[in-house]
A protein has these predicted regions:
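Helix-to-loop junction immediately C-terminal to a conserved catalytic motif
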Residues: 49
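Conserved ABC ATPase "signature" region
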Residues: 98, 113-131, 156
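The feature captures the beta-strand-to-loop junction immediately N-terminal to the Walker
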Residues: 34-36
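ABC ATPase nucleotide-binding domains
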Residues: 234-258
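Conserved ABC ATPase signature
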Residues: 135-139, 143
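Conserved ABC transporter NBD signature motif
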Residues: 57-65, 74
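Catalytic Walker B motif of ABC-type/P-loop ATPase nucleotide-binding domains
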Residues: 160-164
Length: 258
């Protein structure tokens, strides 16, 4: 499944947010979207997901314009993993994951045995199979986010869109969730992920897309594209890049422009 964004622009009434955005995604890659608050990362995702449709330009899925694709079919192509999920009712983890098959069911139909099997396989792939009967509302740490990833896998979409998935997690759970997501790219999944943490983008991404002033500031391989100059342009923070045995680390300056 290939996603192509061509000359995408979007405005809220008279307020332009995105202007002439161009990029594509590749199967088996994690593409991180970076940029300051309010730059349009979430708006970009809402356009891609079909929530916002009054954009200019093209959003193509395997060559088809997204606005011409019905929501049920769109759900078979792209899965959305939000920052958080607060269920209205006391659904179990397995119930939550099974919601990923909704677009494949007729109205009022219940999930069948094959759907339960798919849900259990999805839970096992992200390591939450032992939580199947627990209440989703009682999960903690990175567990809810991993369950939402499992739900997306159960949806059987090949493109996963994640809007700041680790923003509310502690350090350890941030790394666990991102390592899990990066691992999915080895199975051919495409992951489009927004983050405010350049280190996460550098460590886990194949490529980065940097947005600034409504447009594309940079696009390319994470190791080559993410530089001190780009971080200054995006966040007005001075940093150094330090090479370690575990990879390159971004170190902010203690004084000066912080």
């Amino acid at each position: 499944m290939k996603l192509e964004i061509k000359n995408l622009s979007f405005a809220y009434r008279d307020h332009p947010v995105l202007q002439d955005i161009n990029f594509d995604t590749r199967p088996g890659e994690l593409l991180s979207v970076l940029g300051p608050n309010g730059v349009g990362k979430s708006t970009l995702f809402r356009c891609i997901l079909g929530i916002l449709r009054d954009y200019q330009g093209e959003i193509l899925l395997d060559g088809r314009e997204a606005r011409g694709i019905a929501q049920r079919e769109m759900a078979s192509m792209i899965a959305y993993i939000p920052q958080s999920h607060r269920p209205t009712f006391g659904y179990t983890v397995q119930d939550t994951v099974l919601m990923g098959v909704t677009h494949r069911l007729s109205p009022f139909a219940a999930p069948r045995a094959e759907h339960v099997r798919q849900a259990r396989e999805a839970m096992a792939r992200v390591g939450v199979q032992d939580m199947a009967d627990r209440s989703f509302a009682h999960l903690s740490g990175g567990e809810p986010q991993l369950v939402l990833v499992a739900r997306a896998l159960c949806q059987q979409s090949r493109i996963l869109v994640m809007d700041e998935p680790t923003s509310s997690l502690d350090f350890g759970n941030q790394l666990r969730v991102l390592a899990c997501v990066r691992g999915l790219t080895q199975e051919g999944y495409t992951v489009l992920l927004s983050t405010h943490n350049p280190q996460h983008a550098l460590t886990f991404s194949h490529r980065i897309l940097a947005l600034h002033d409504g447009g594309v500031a940079a696009l390319g391989d994470a190791g080559d594209t993410l530089t001190p100059e780009l971080i200054w342009q995006l966040y007005q923070v001075e940093v150094d890049f330090v090479d370690t045995q575990q990879g390159r680390v971004i170190v902010p300056h203690r004084g000066g422009s912080l």
